[in-house]
Structure formats: C-alpha cells, structure tokens
Amino acid sequence: METHIIKRDGKSEIFSIDKIKNAINKAFIASGTFATEETMAAIISRLRIHDGISVEEIQNQVEVALMAEGYYQVAKNYMIYRYRHTKDRETMDKLDFLMNYCNASNAATGSKYDANANVEKKNIATLIGELPKSNYIRLNRRMLTDRIEKMFGKELADKYMALLKQHFIYKNDETSLANYCASITMYPWLLEGTKAIGGNATPPTNLKSFCGGFINMVFMVSSMLSGACATPEFLMYMNYFIGKEYGNDYYLHADKVVDLSKRQRTIDKVITDCFEQVVYSINQPTGARNFQSVFWNISYYDRYYFESIFGEFRFPDGEKPDWDSLNWLQKRFMKWFNAERLRSVLTFPVETMALLSENGDVKDKEYADFTAEMYAEGHSFFTYLSDNADSLASCCRLRNEITDNGFSYTLGAGGVSTGSKSVLTINLNRTVQYAVRQGMSYLTY
C-alpha cells in the first residue's frame, strides 16, 4: 500500500525514502564526511512514517534521529539546509506573487492577503505595500498570542488561533502594525502646529493656512493609523477662521464679493473653494498608506449636542465658538458635499449627524427637519441619536464614551479624543452554520 505525505502547499504526494536519504547525504557532505549504508539504515530506522504525515514532521524526525545517533554537526548542517530551503521557498512565493499581481485584472484579485483593502488602482506603489503583508500577519499573531498566553494561559491562546484559522472570527488589519482608528482633537495643532507629531509646520493663522495645514495634519496622523482618522471639530475650527477674516456674521452676507481678483469671488465661493480644496485633497491616494487615501470622518451637531460638548470650549485667544455661523456652515457643507458627489466619486469624509433626543424624539426640531431633508435629497450619512451628549459616534464606532476618559485641555477643549487599538469581528454566518451542522443550538454555541 502506498504511503502519502502532505506537502507544505497542502497537496498530497507519494512518499519517497530517496528524497530523505538525499537530504541526509548532503548534510553529511557539508560536515566533511559521508554516511555509510549502516549509518543511513540506523538513522532511517528511527523514523516513524505514516499515511498523511506532513513534510515538516518528517524533517523534524530526521533532526531528532541524527542527534540520537550522535551526529550533532550533521544535524546542525541539516537544520541549516532546511532553513535555506525555507528562505528559497519564501523568495519563490514572493516572485510568484509579483507575477500574479502584475497579471491580475485588478488590485483586489491580485491581493493574496488583504483583498478587502481600500485599493482601487494596481500599480508599483500598491504592489510594494502588498509584499510585506504576510510578515506583518505572522508578527501580529505572534505578539497577540504571546500576550493572551501571558495574561490568560496557553489554552486560550491556542483557542484564539484555532477560531481565527477556522474563520469563526476575523482580526481586522493584521497586515499593519499601526493602531486601528482614532478620533482626535485638533487643539494641540492650534497651539503648536504639527511639531507634537514630528512635523515642522507652525499653527494656522488664517483660513488658507488652516485648510492647507489641516490636510497635512490629517495625512500625518493617518500615516500612523491603519483605519480611520476622525476630526469632530473640523467645521467648528474652520468656522472660527472664517469669522476671523469676514466676521462672525459672515453668513448673513455670504453673497458679498470679497475677492479683488478678476474672479470676484463671494464669501460663499471662498468657503466652497475651501471645501473643495480639503475634500479633494484628502480623497487623493498617498504613498504613506500604500497608494490609498486616508479614511476621514467628521461630525455635525444640533444646537443642544453642540452646547453640551463645546459649551465651555475656548479657542487659544479666549473666543467662544459661534453657534449661529457654525449652524449655517454645517448645512452649507452638507448641501455642497451632496451636490459634489453627483460630479465625482468622493468617499470621504464619512459623516455622522449627532442629535440629542428627549422623550423618544429629537430635541432640536430644526435639525430633525434638516436631517430628514438631507436624506430625502439622497445624501448618505450616519445619524447618531443619544439622550445624553456623553459620547460621540464616528463611522463604525457605535459609541465612544467621552465623559470620564475624554481628552480635555485646561482652556476648555471638548473631550473628543478616543479610538481603538484593533477590531475583532465575529463571523456569525460561519458560527450559525457550524452549530446547525453539529446539531447544536446556535444561540447556545
């Protein structure tokens, strides 16, 4: 009866003793000697080959057999031989991946480890980002299982790996070492520019420097994240700089011409040009994220939500945020962004409307009507309802508590800094199917 072994790629092959003898002979020759028939027979006799055994297990047995027979130098050379072949196989795997990626119809089908990555174009930049992903996956899994074993024991660490490999759970962004996502306050940027995060830009002083600096700041922060970067204060800060140039009542005369150039731009046109600059720039691919755009989230607030979170907020010069002008700016941005999406595919920002509820209804009727109006016009955004403005929601983050652990500057900056290290997803479909097939209640399982 023929004995079959399992190769590294999972394929079955008929067992050949000659291949083992050949590898052992090479190890002896590398040690400056050779194996006699008696020596070879003694080593082979220690092997226990059975149907379905893996190549790795056979090679492990050969190492043990060589040391048991006293051929320690030969065993060492055999291990080196295995290591070099492993490296050769990894190199060949990389070369195969390179060719397959180049021949793939698109970036998703060409990606071996991360087909869900937000990559639209297939080019050298995306290819460079794909190459090290298998190494990152191994490193991330090793770090996490080591920590689980240290905190809860080896049994749970092994269970985690089993659930992962059997696809009961999915660990997001194992192909990156960076944290998953973060909601940030931009207050340090107002004080020190980008110096706190390794940049050299000075704080913004006007509307133009705010827009340009904001883009750079978001790109810098996002380069250190594998997921989203949320800026809940974006429109509030923009409103502050607009007010510094045109007065806090600028929205009352938005059609006023304020541009001395031939274009004769109005205040409204200046503002929408700023929208265009920021949104289109952030939707561009970036080398720091393997030719992906950043994942950017923003928030809108009704009056009560805004006052609850930013009521005591003060800008560095001591000025309070002006709600009336911000109210106009929020609505103007939503209207502009919804219309702009008819002209171009703009994924970001991902928007969340935060509404305070009372007795089962939205407290701010003006924003309840406006939210419904935007949905009726076909706009796509999240709506977060809460009866207590103690939390924020951004995109997939259902609820971020900010009352107890929120970031707060002594000048009164709102507590909007939060985020997550990583995200773990339960594969409910797989879980239910497995439980049913095993005759178990999927609810209990």
Feature locations, PLM:
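Conserved catalytic cores of very large enzyme subunits
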Residues: K87, K94-Y445
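Charged, amphipathic alpha-helical regulatory modules used
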Residues: M1-A107
